[in-house]
Amino acid sequence: MQTLKTARLTSNPASIPTSSSSSAISAAAIQKTLDAVNRPPAVRASGILRHRTLPAPTQETAHHLDADPKTTELMARFFISQGIPFECAHEPAFLELMKHVDPNCVIPPTNVTKKLVDKISTSSKPQVNYTKTVGPLSVTIDICGDEDEKYLAFSIHYFEDLYERKNAIYLRKLLLTELDSNSLLTNIRRSVNSYSFSNVKFTNIVCPNEEICKLVEESAVVKRYNVCFYNYVTRFVADLMEIEEFSSGLTQLRTFVRYMKQNSDMYSKFRRMQLQKNAELDIPSIDSGDWHSTAIFLTRCLVWHDTFTEFCGKLDILHYIDNETFNHLIYLQRLLQQCMKHCRELSIPNNSISQVVPAIMSIRNFIASNSMGYRFQKRIRDSFTTSFKEITSGPSQDRYDIATLLDPRFAYRDTVYTAQTWRSLEKKVIDDFVNSDLQNDKNFYQDISILNQEQRYDIIKKEFAYYRQTSFVERPEENENSNHWWGMRQTDMEFLAVIAREYLASPAVSIDAGYYFGNGGKFQHICHTYSHQRLENCLALAGNYQTFRGKGASVDVISQSMIETLNNTASRLQKQVHLGLYAHGVDNISSDRDVQSIVGHHYPPMPTVANYDIPHVPKEEEKPPVANLQSTSSPATSSPTIIRPRAAPPPRTLAQGRPIPLNGKELKAVPIRQIPLQVRPLPPRPANVPIVPRPTVPQQFIKAPAPKPITLQAVVCSIPEKEIKKETEDVALLEKIKDEPLDEDDFNHPSTDPVPNRTTASSQGPSSYPRKIVVLASKLPTSQSSSPSTATSAQARSHVTTAQLIRCGPSEGTVPQKIHSHNFVQKFAQKQNFVHKYALNSQDHTGRLNQTVPMRAALRLPNSEQKSGAPSSINGKVQRDDFKLEPLDDFNGEPDYDNLIGAQRLMYSDNLNDASAEDAFARHRVTMEFQKRRACNRRCAVCGHLEIHERLKNVTIENEKLLIMLGCIYRGEFTLGQAQLFMARESKTYICRLHFLETLDEIYQMLRLKSADDILICPLDLIQNALITVSALRPHIIASQLRKILHDFAERNNHLRETPAELKKLGQQYFDYREPEPEPERNDVDEQEIIPKLFRQPRKQVLEADQHDGTVKVIEQEDFKLPTVKPSENEECDNPGVCCFCSKRGDRGGMLRVPRSEERLARWVDKLGPEFEARLHTNTENLICRSHFPDAAFSSRGRLLKGMIPDAAPEKVETTYIIQGNNFLKLKERKSGTDKNSAIDLANMLNPDGVEYTQEEEEEEEYEEMSRSPTEETSDDEPSQAAVYNNAPVIKRTYRKRELSNEDGPLNLVTPPAHTPNPRGRPRKYPKNSVTPEAEKSLTDYDYNPGTSQRRALKKGYVQLEDGEIVGEDCEYVPEKTPSGRLIRQAVARRSFAFADEEEEEEEYEESPIVKKPKIAGRPVGRPRKDANKLPTPTPPSNE
């Protein structure tokens, strides 16, 4: 019997594939075979098994699947373009990806992929088709590697069309490490055309550095050689890294980071501190490689500066940077960030050489505008000039400048070059085109060899004119492609577009070989994996799929949040290091809270200082006076004071006040006028006011030294005498001077003269002005003396027995304010009454202000102008109008030139009492309510003269100050040191407008000019001579900038040189600003016709044609008249006021005060007319409603802006007429600003009585009226109609309403003939007048109502005679007949009643005899109406 075992042995097992089978069998077939072999046997029933033959299993055929050729090719191209080896195709992660994309995809073997790559690289065609290129051919090269292996990367740039430049990338491995120009250029030329490479030549080549440029410049293959822009920037940054402040700071940062990473204990503590704050844990990586990594490392460390400082403070780590080093490094970081920004912009694929010059100018402007006064800034400027001198002043300068000119993104921009430079560059391009050789002529599409030089000049000149206009109007953005811009305008500028493509084709930077073959490069791995031949094939294929990446390209890892953190940290630390410059003169900063309040506030940037490398000066150094303002006895030699950029200035206080500490601040006290207090009662003194004891009685006080007087003979003689203000002539004018401690010090010339009653007064010089004097005793040692000054060293001492505050001088009221001559102002001169800024009020509202205030005060000298007979007694009382307290201002600038007259030295006591603090608080509240200041005269910062505010200018432009100082130095009025001090002052600079004319004259004389435009063409040596002096004041200014500054100043102030004679030549009236009256236009229309109004010259009317041809709109504009409101429109309020514009009575809160200055008041009166001037009051304040101004006339705080005038638009009346023949028919009339209008219905021409007439009836009626015999029977007592009209004068078109009175004499009115009443007559109401009974009989209720044409003629002043003729003063009316027998109404001439002004009409009317046109009852001519008998007989009006 056969057992199960033997049955199994006799079975034929399934065939297993041998190892020699192809590896291309799919994984599914292999898995299916293995499952068939390992399948378990079938379960059989127990018992004897019979022998039977089992059928053999069917063998599955193994299919050898091949990969898709297209899939293999695409996979090979992708792997090699990214520098990935082919073996990565069988990685599990990639297989899983492919199985997810396509489960049936077959991955090709590695050897198949390598063979495919070799085949593609050997059979591929060149990327650049040299025969089909358009325009120039450019190439950039770069070499990377070490001494053993070197790799070459180059890019070829060409044009296939006119709109875009193509870029082709090539990657090669060099066989020899020693470079040879012939082999290098041959390799590049074979890439373009491998068969005839000797014909390939390049227009431009960009080399990575000077060494390679010198290597290939000997060849004749290239026309122009350029060096990569990134090389110049790298050279500049390398010089920056060698600066001691920068290198030491970077070394400290690297040492600290290495220490943190090497010490595990420190690093764990740092991480725990960051975890508590939920902040970032990683420490910045140390830089390695180029300066890009250094900039990123520096940025991240500075962002972490506060964290590192806190950590070092907790663990007492000393080797970290301090705040001053941080300020130095933040300056370096911002400069490196600017360099990275421009390198990143110039490394894009479509970059051009035209972007180089704007990038350099941007970096230079950043250095000039961020001058912080550091010592190393001069070295930075020198390094910048040295690094970029080959571009800005080398042999390749013209190539870069012309490329910038032909780039529409930067052409003709003032930020790049001046207008004169752009014109000179245009001239160079024109000369090159006119004088081009035959080789360059082939570049153009047309044959220009047949054109002569004049024709070429005209062509290129016209194209430049069109380009200059188009580049301004259609300027592209900086990120757009300039080649596309030129391609779109090829037809408009045919020759100039070819020249522009020739210059713009060259890239600004070379290709970056380090990106491909450097450390961590894209192809670094395959370079060390494959052999030379296999690597060469891979690189040849990989270059076809690369985009151009220039040197300097980097990823911007500096986020906006990092920049904000840096700015906030820099702002705070800048104020901590230079706290004195931001403390606003407060010298008692003792607590950390005060420091934080100053540091935490927003701060302005540090001042720009001219002298950067000058050492500090001791504080006792005196300020040199102006040479011309010194007396003859003063020494002529004076060393210039050196500017200290970081030194905190000494604390300064007001010249007429004293500092009063209150709540941690110092308040200042200045004299205040008597002001009517219209505020709520002052609250009680707060509880937190400190109480301090009264000072003890001092034994003596110290008098301030007297400076040397100034003689008027030392004033500059070049100033015209009419412009010099002599302060000694009018003492009353000097009383109007406002003490302005905010801008300038208060100086005088005291002399020691005894004054009775224990005080010392000084007799002031002729140039001093009176002021209120405050003397307060101070407890000082006897040996103490005042600070040094320019005055004599002798100091008089006096004794005071009580510590009281006295007020020496006149106690008059408010100082009068001067208003210059005007019609309105003359009223004040006649009444000898001046306008006060605040009305005087004798009520006492100040509370405790009249108590004794023995507080800390400045030691001042008595006023010498007080009366000698009025001794200054110490009464211990403070007048309520003596002082006003304000927060202390910022005096962080250098001393002004004001102290040339002499500065008062101030002495203080050390104690306060409770009464003084309470009074200070009360006065401070009063000051806050009245912030407005008095109109004042100011002192010129140059000459020291006192002028009114209108004759001074607050100079805020730095260039204007520079040129004014330049003129003063050339005239010998200022020394160089004094000019440096003037440029360093930070307070407001008020300068006489006369100095601008003097400076302009000095510029004209210095540069030998005739006009302002001559500055652009003046010789360079004259500019260089002026630059020597300017460089001492502002070292960063170059010659081109100085030329532009001079030109702008001359253009802005050239009107000061124009004389009245020159202005008259220009047609302007210098003394009378009224424009000349235009000549009346003549009317040349034929006199045989009646001229319609459409062709007449309107009087104060504007004709506007409507859309329809038959209508005309007439806008009558009347003169502006001030509105007058009705009494019902007035408002009832608690605080009423009357508007002088509309006479409306309303709340004062909604009104403004009318300005009182001469200039503004004159403009208002000129605009609003004499009626507005008549409404102004002299003794009370004048108000005007806020509603009379537009919304734009007010500032954000609700104040009226200077120069704003109320709306004074004249009223307009719009009337629309329809033209029918020669007649105008009025349709509607509307007044501006109202809804009132009048209109008639032309379709229904109804008469006043309601009867409708057709056109034929009207003409027939007019025919009968004019053809009828005028000889009607009249009574003997009643004259005829013709007699009445012949005796009446011609009345003008405009009649004035005039009451009839007996004073005018008897009226010569004659009763008209008695006719049948005309039904169409209109009743007229006559005014009640005192007339004679005879005149009353002649008046009727009906007017004379002739025909249509006659009515129109009579309205215009014509008179109808007895024979039917209608005549005027200079014309007659002649009726003519039509072919049908009807008359034609036509006049021989017309009478024009247009007058130039309404006032002329009134005057002429008054001259004519007053004869009223008679009222004629009924119609003298024409047929009577059918219903005439139905009307009642009219009766004359009664006397009621």
Swiss-Prot record:
InterPro entries: Lin-15B-like (IPR040129), RNaseH-like_sf (IPR012337), THAP_Znf (IPR006612). One of its GO terms (cellular component) is nucleus. Residues 1254-1264, 1396-1407 have a biased composition (Acidic residues). One of its GO terms (biological process) is negative regulation of Ras protein signal transduction. Residues 10-22, 631-646 have a biased composition (Low complexity). Residues 1-22, 48-67, 618-660, 738-769, 1239-1281, 1298-1350, 1395-1440 are annotated as: Disordered. The keyword Chloroplast does not apply. One of its GO terms (molecular function) is zinc ion binding. SUPFAM superfamilies: Ribonuclease H-like. It holds the Pfam family Lin-15B. Disruption phenotype: No obvious vulval development defects. Double knockout with the synthetic multivulva class A protein lin-15A results in a multiple vulva (Muv) phenotype. Double knockout with the programmed cell death regulator mcd-1 results in 100% lethality during the L1 stage of larval development. The keyword Ribosomal protein does not apply. Keywords: Developmental protein, Differentiation, DNA-binding, Metal-binding, Repeat, Sexual differentiation, Zinc, Zinc-finger. SMART domains: DM3, THAP. Residues 757-767 have a biased composition (Polar residues). A zinc finger (THAP-type) spans 1135-1209. It comes from the Eukaryota. Residues 1317-1329, 1418-1430 bind DNA. Synthetic multivulva (synMuv) class B protein. SynMuv proteins are required to repress the induction of vulval development. Acts redundantly with SynMuv class A protein lin-15A to negatively regulate vulval development. Regulates let-23 basal activity. The proteins lin-15A and lin-15B are produced from a single precursor mRNA with non-overlapping transcripts where lin-15B is the upstream transcript and lin-15A is the downstream one. The precursor mRNA is cleaved at the polyadenylation site and a 22-nucleotide SL2 leader sequence is trans-spliced to the 5'-end of lin-15A to allow its translation. This is Protein lin-15B. It comes from Caenorhabditis elegans.
